[in-house]
């Protein structure tokens, strides 16, 4: 559960029954990885779904434009939409992501600082800032990622305490064009006073990754199916992402 809970809930009155009267986190974000591709630009397409047990499926299609400004700084503007069987898909948030790489191979791991500014599109909704360290290392042909993020609300969301979440990923370079692995995400509640375990959200599952040459650039894709808890309830998630680098 995170500050983003309130952002989503203000726009999901039709799904109030799902929320059981409490705030719940937006559970779908993608594993932040360390970038080191100076000058590369990206068109970013994302799509993910959440299917809580006994409730209708919620979908989040997203589209973004990214730019590796140099060997240390990646920035992206992202529009996130939301939809369900009970209402039409609409613009939900505008997001600005910035990742700054602090190390470049001089240590056994690479460290980046990640920030994400989240601006909801419904009235009187405030905004939120996600920030924290992103770690990446390689063990043989396996890439490992682990990230810890804090999220703080401002404006009408300022009453929400700063929340703590985590991400992890294992990615084995099986062939040149296909990698296999796993991903996991979780939200534990306020950073300095974790929720009871039964009220936390944790989910994990298998993931596939691939890349396809496309003229002067590359099309990269990934997909994952995660099981566990979303909204502190049992529910499954499917995520898919396609990046066109040029």
Give each language-model segment a name.
Residues 24-246:
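Transmembrane beta-barrel domains of Gram-negative outer membranes and organellar outer membranes
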Residues 1-29:
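Cleavable N-terminal export/targeting peptides
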């Amino acid at each position: 559960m995170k500050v983003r809970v309130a952002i989503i809930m203000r726009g999901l009155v039709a799904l109030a029954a799902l929320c059981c009267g409490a705030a719940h986190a937006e559970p779908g974000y993608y594993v932040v990885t360390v970038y080191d591709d100076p000058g590369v630009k990206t068109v970013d397409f994302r799509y993910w779904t959440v299917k809580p047990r006994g409730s209708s499926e919620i979908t989040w299609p997203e589209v973004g434009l990214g730019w590796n400004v140099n060997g240390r700084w990646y920035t992206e503007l992202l529009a996130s939409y939301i939809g369900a069987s009970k209402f039409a898909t609409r613009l939900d948030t505008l997001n600005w992501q910035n990742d700054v790489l602090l190390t470049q191979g001089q240590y056994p791991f690479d460290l980046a600082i990640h920030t994400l500014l989240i601006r909801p599109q419904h009235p009187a909704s405030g905004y939120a800032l996600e920030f924290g360290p992103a770690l990446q290392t390689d063990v043989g042909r396996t890439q490992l990622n682990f990230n810890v993020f804090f999220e703080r609300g401002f404006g009408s969301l300022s009453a929400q305490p700063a929340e703590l979440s985590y991400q992890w990923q294992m990615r084995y370079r099986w062939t040149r064009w296909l990698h296999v692995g796993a991903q996991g995400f979780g939200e534990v509640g306020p950073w300095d006073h974790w929720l009871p375990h039964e009220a936390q959200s944790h989910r994990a599952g298998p993931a596939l990754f691939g890349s396809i040459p496309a003229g002067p650039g590359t099309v990269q894709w990934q997909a994952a199916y995660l099981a566990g808890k979303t909204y502190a309830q049992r529910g499954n998630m499917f995520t898919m992402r396609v990046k066109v680098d040029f």
